[in-house]
Amino acid sequence: MRHLLALLMLAAGPTFAQTEDTPEQTPAINVVSGNPAAVNIDAGTGQLGELIGLTPDTGFRLGGVLLADFNWLVTGGKEPGKTGWNFLFILGGNVDLDKTIGLPGAEVGSQFLLYKGYDVNGQAGSVLGYNSLEASPPLGRTELYQLWWRQALLDDRLTIRVGKSVPTIDFTNVLAPIPVENEPFPVPSLSGLIYTPAFVNPTTEGAMPGYYDSAWGVTLNITPIEQFYVNWGIYDGSLASGFTTGDHAFPHFNGTYFMIAEMGGTWKLGEDELLGRAGFGGWQQTGNLTNGTITEDGTYGFYGFAAQTIWQETGHADESGQGIIGFFQWGINDSETMPFNGFMGAGATAFGVIPSRPNDTIGVGAAYGWLNPNNFQRDHELMLQTYYQAQVFDNLFVQPVVTYIKDPGASPSYSDAWALSFRVTVLF
């Protein structure tokens, strides 16, 4: 059950999630994120590097992830019967500068991203987005996804990361766990849901950089005690004015900024010490934001999330553990131009429910967004999603996904939609 419990540690992001592997340790994999590019700072498991001799003791890490899915809009939406596919490839490497050149607490990292796909969310008329691999246009990208320097200070209680990165990894990230007791979990998640609200709070969408529009900026993390953290970040804010920050390799500071801060912590409930965690944050976007004839001078918002172990079963030393974890999200903003003004979401994941398949998971999720009346004629969109994620072998996972979209928000003329997806994830 130790692996299941580790999935519920602080979601303070990668700034203090960099645990050191030893030659005796083997990266453990439990549930894999429906979109690892959105919630994990390290690409894949690092086994690609080990194949060419880059073992953890060398200070070098090379890994990657490949995702591909097929989607069928069975009925409803904008284009019922339509199909589409998505393909994502990420290759990344890190260098521990302490091990390589003797610079304590320093690390550099970089990732390359290749994406190609279809407007499957547009086919369904979904503003929330039932498939997180499809983000904003263009729908074909080759880009420098990340390039950063991370410096740990004060016994890792303060870390600073400077460069091009993905803020949704550090902020609003309800799904990302943190390793405990020096156990490496390179690509775990609290859920395998694939819909977009699981990875970016809809009330920040259009302003907050993330997958796949990463941005240049600075991220600070403070962890005075193990059970509490504070994160703060400031980034290039030109995404809100329509500039695609992800597919531009160099900084593009035009006087607008996206600033965000988050604090959170963990707890244990009852005799079984059921782990839970929660976070709360606020953000501000500067600059003139426009939508048609409407203009506003910046905007701001608040969000929160929580996760709790609901049930766990111990005594399965040969398995990853059995249990159920639930999570909750919310967000609001004061924007006149962004797509959503409010959001609530929740979900649950069952781990190891089939004794002979300890690394399979079953999950459900619900997302409800209040649409900005300046942008849409409908005032809301509701999405329900369920999946079964199966580990075929080692680092290969497959998952069928069923999504129901009630009142697709793009147009009041679109009827309720049903979509089927089949995703394959390969980690290396």
Indicate residue ranges for each PLM-predicted region.
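Transmembrane beta-barrel strands of outer-membrane/channel proteins
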Residues: 64-70, 108-114, 160-164, 230-236, ...
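Long, well-ordered mid-to-C-terminal structural blocks that present hydrophobic/aromatic surfaces
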Residues: 266-355
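Surface-exposed loop and membrane-interface regions of Gram-negative outer-membrane beta-barrel proteins
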Residues: 72-87, 101-146, 153, 243, ...
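Membrane-embedded beta-strands of outer-membrane beta-barrel proteins
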Residues: 91, 147, 160, 218, ...
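Short loop/turn motifs that connect adjacent beta-strands in outer-membrane beta-barrel proteins
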Residues: 45-62, 95-108, 154-157, 227, ...
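N-terminal periplasmic/intermembrane-space "pro-region" immediately following the signal or transit peptide
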Residues: 13-69, 73, 96, 101-102
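Outer-membrane beta-barrel "beta-signal"
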Residues: 416-428
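Surface-exposed coil loops of outer-membrane beta-barrel proteins
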Residues: 120-148, 156-257
